[in-house]
Amino acid sequence: MQSCESSGDSADDPLSRGLRRRGQPRVVVIGAGLAGLAAARALLEQGFTDVTVLEASSHIGGRVQSVRLGDTTFELGATWIHGSHGNPIYQLAEANGLLEETTDGERSVGRISLYSKNGVACYLTNRGCRIPKDVVEEFSDLYNEVYNMTQEFFRHGKPVNAESQNSVGVFTREKVRNRIRDDPDDTEATKRLKLAMIQQYLKVESCESSSHSIDEVSLSAFGEWTEIPGAHHIIPSGFMRVVELLAEGIPPHVIQLGKPVRCIHWDQASAHPRGPEIEPRGEGDHNHDTGEGGQSGENPQQGRWDEDEPWPVVVECEDCEVIPADHVIVTVSLGVLKRQYTSFFRPCLPTEKVAAIHRLGIGTTDKIFLEFEEPFWGPECNSLQFVWEDEAESCTLTYPPELWYRKICGFDVLYPPERYGHVLSGWICGEEALVMERCDDEAVAEICTEMLRQFTGNPNIPKPRRILRSAWGSNPYFRGSYSYTQVGSSGADVEKLAKPLPYTESSKTAPMQVLFSGEATHRKYYSTTHGALLSGQREAARLIEMYRDLFQQGP
């Protein structure tokens, strides 16, 4: 790692030259989600004073979105703290008395029904019949046994055979089907039910991975994702409380809301020794202003453009303001990178990083909350799971647009009713979730009601009094829910995505110009809130280490 206090030819080091003039490195963080806030807070706590966070939307939190309706908080985004042992999100929430335990540390059968440890999942068929409890338990034991086998390919280096196509879904479907068909104790009718249940479980798995289909998730890389031991927890007051606690260590003027970025111009000093390729429109200190978010323009060493000492990075905002910086930490989602990497970076990203962006996957998992006047489900029921009997032999989890509702795997009962009222939370993912997002509330409520009537066999279920749903796929600032290792990708691609720019170290090139964080950049904890937070702290630590000598010397 190149140090800002390097000896020898440090006079020619663009980073050292800039620091002699400015005194403090300027860091711009793009995104005020968990990763961006964690990075900014860590830098500020270690003595960095010229830090700016640019958030495209009107609020902080990123993919944490707690919506308050009356006295109740609903989570459109992150919902659970997954595991407690060493989980920094858990530690922050626990220290502030925010937690409520929802499951024990074991992998639950429904695995997405984490609102309550109590009750049972009701597996219902499209003919309006409930699958017997013993059949559900037998199938769940078999499925979980095969699921554990999917972990062994990465963890034990087992070779993947060609028949599986290196796909979690293909492997699981085939293994479970063969075991069901070969079972001499089951009747043909029971076998048909269990075969149909495979697709329902794989829909749940697809929602959990936020893939269009679990068939697209890499079998050889699947076991690298690591589950933190301990119980799952929810935060009754809203997951946004964690975001707010994280932001408490950041002065308000550091965060600029409604500030989308158009382009990051990096490697400016080496490419243009006399100045940037675009003209600055914003002068003034972007951190040490009046404390009210304005620009004082009183400190030319920190805030004004200096063509004799060009900045390594220039952030061009959509409102045409241009912010020069020594370092930029990019926390945008993988979905945004996939959509915008060609225009978001100048010069273009290295081929290796572009390839990693292409290979890694991100999809959409959406929630549909339905509120009813009275419950039509029993007090022992914690979820309603939909099993289509005509999918017993199906080999796909893709449906035509007019059948998008078939991707809804089921509805969880929000618990306790004293807090939530009588509310169901449905799950849908993939391209079908995008179709759902394009429908209006009335249409979605109507279709969900018809499904509930069909699967429960109760034609008298009323329409919900209220509907609330997420739309992560069509949101231009996210373009998806969270990442996964797609077939053809591996943890090595996560490392490539996280690698700072520029790749080469030179006395002529400022180091660590563009850094990358966010859940998709954490090799073990991608897709999680703790992975996002840890990735932000990781990138901050790179800069803290780089400037260690500077801050140890003091003023």
Swiss-Prot record:
The Swiss-Prot or TrEMBL record lists the needed cofactor(s) as:
FAD
**Protein residues bound to FAD:** 35, 55, 63, 79-80, 261, 519, 528-529
Q: Quickly give the catalysed reaction.
A: spermine + O2 + H2O = 3-aminopropanal + spermidine + H2O2
Q: Which domain of life is it from?
A: Eukaryota
Let me know which tissues express this protein, per UniProt. Widely expressed. Isoform 1 and isoform 2 are expressed at higher level in brain and skeletal muscle. Isoform 7 is found in brain and spleen, isoform 10 is widely expressed but found at lower level in heart, kidney, liver and lung.
Q: Which GO terms describe its biological process?
A: spermine catabolic process
Please tell me where this protein is predominantly located.
Answer: cytoplasm
**UniProt-annotated location(s):** Cytoplasm
Protein family according to the UniProt entry: Belongs to the flavin monoamine oxidase family.
UniProt name for this protein: Spermine oxidase
Native source organism of the sequence: Mus musculus (Mouse)
Gene from which this protein is expressed: Smox
